[in-house]
Amino acid sequence: MIVKVPITICTMIAGYTGLITNLVYHRGKKVRMAFGFIYPTDFAAHVVYMIAAWVLIRQVRCSWIEIGMMMICVIFFEKYCDVRTSEAVMILLILCVIYLKIRNALAEKKGTKYKPSVLLKCLCLVIPYSLAGFMILTSRFYNPEITWMSKLNTLFSTRLAIGKEAFERYDIKLWGQNIPMIGNGGTTEPVQGYFFLDSSYVNILLRLGLVVFILIMLMISIIMIRNINQPYILAVMVIICIHSVMEHHMFELFCDVFLMLPFAKFGVEENEKELEKYKVTS
């Protein structure tokens, strides 16, 4: 956060002022700015992941001012970027923070600490697999002649049709494969032969292979199980999984730092004991 926030702000300012290229796209009457990034959705994803990390750091200490700043981000996204997935995910994150803030306040009045119910814990554990299975299966078996699939494909900006094409051309490999992709990012010129796997689940499964896909899903489960009584971590992981249905940033560690959580130590006392081993006595 110490490094990423200043760099992101500097990139935004440089892009907006013209010091570096600011790619500007149009969707209907809406203007979509990338603010120095390769594409508006990439810029928004970086901001969403940073805010999610900030929420995880602050947790119950998140103030109403901070929540207000998150709302301003949603308005900013809508006005300058038109990034529907990131906007929806940000709104969901805000609602989760407000809900947890209220639940913690009510629990404190009773002299206790809020812990999620067993049902909520189970739901959080199931959601990543449900979302992954839904996106993979609807892409693999997409049929434009089925009305609900056709409408869903339109809602998902043709992600199902492109996923179907990817499965037909490459299919699943154990250790992954090279899949050349052509996206809209990096240029405002019309792209010929657009082919980009936006969904993280389909992207990881086809490009990195079944083994890596299973390992990543297990890592998500490990993070949740290890922090099963930490509602903020559960909420953030679920939100990242929802975001990954439509966007491809799940396995980009410069964006999704949460995948490193299984290797992190959160216990202050444990860390202090570990440091004691390496202290040099005079």
Predicted regions and their residues:
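Hydrophobic transmembrane alpha-helices of multi-pass, membrane-embedded glycosylation machinery
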Residues: M1, I51-V55, M71-I75, E87-L100, ...
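Aromatic-anchored segments of alpha-helical transmembrane domains
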Residues: P6-T17, I72-Y80, P128-I136, M237-H249
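Helix-loop-helix junctions and helix-breaking kinks within/between transmembrane helices
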Residues: P40-T41, E66-A105, L205-L210, M246-L253
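Membrane-interface helix-loop-helix junctions at transmembrane boundaries of multi-pass membrane enzymes
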Residues: I57-G68, G111-L119, S221-V236
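A membrane-periplasm/extracellular boundary helix in multi-pass inner-membrane enzymes
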Residues: C81, I98-S150
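Long extracytoplasmic/lumenal interhelical loops at the membrane interface
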Residues: W148-L208
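Hydrophobic transmembrane alpha-helices and their immediate junctions
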Residues: R207-C241, F266-E270, E274
